[in-house]
Amino acid sequence: MEKFINNAPFALVLIFLVMGFVLLIKGADFFVEGSSSVAKRLHVPSIIIGLTIVAMGTSLPETAVSVSASLTGNNELAVSNVVGSNIFNLMVVIGVCAMIATVNVAEETIKRDIPISLVCAGFLLLLGIVGLGDKEGMILGHFDGIIFLCAYAVYIFHLIKTALKASKEDGKVEIEGGSDEDIKLVSVPMSILFIVGGAIAIAIGGDMTVDAASRIAGDLGMSQTLIGLIIVSIGTSLPELVTSIVAARKNEVGMALGNAIGSNVFNIFMVLGIASAISPITIVAENIIDLCVLIVFTVCVWIFAGTKRKIGRMEGSCMVALYASYVVYIMIR
């Protein structure tokens, strides 16, 4: 695939990039639907399905891109894809939602999820600079990846324990992915087909996206960091943006911020954890700057959310404007 894309006309490379996005997004949808159906047939509680399979499914495109980039030595793309996606989810997806309809913020999002998200970004910054598992800094090595994966396992165990307790006390708890009725049951053969077909589509889409993005960066004289921060991260996050806009128009954005924060935690701990555990990832100076920007933006959203327990049109406009300013900065730096 890489050899073919490198020798293809530029217009065809752009088509391959779009095709890669489509395969990633649709593959993730099929994989989640098949996995959720199997889990439901095995009588796995919907709370656990929502917090694991469904929540992770939204980040499968980022996972595929970063793992593929890590394996092919495109380290800048592996990190910038995750950081760029986190910034886009936080500032644009939530910002646009807030511009359409007020986003109410749950107390646990302010007291638990946003602080954990800040710890994640700070932890990545620390490991990126120090490189605890390697002799030299600026590298996420195998040991660092294992640390990330273990940290996420503890985090998800805490979420499941908390959700199950809330479910017993209140009889119902909101989760990403919705309630029992939102999980479609399909036949076992069809579920297996969805899982296998979705996984294949994700793998092919990840390789296609990375190869096309690398070729575009080379032809336009742009760094892989820039391509990852803007084009790839936005492409893999478009489903969340479209879904959030539709929900905002129906005034159903109560879980929007919590879901975005949860996705950001997954992207850092699991996506980069898997990628670096498979193949060490080099951190470049630009990644450090972008991580600092992510931390600053997260603090801004924390302040917006904490003042009135909601994010309104004014705050949403500020968030989108901050993101636009950031894009201008990374294009001229």
Where are these regions (language model features)?
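Hydrophobic alpha-helical segments, chiefly the membrane-spanning helices
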Residues: M1-R333
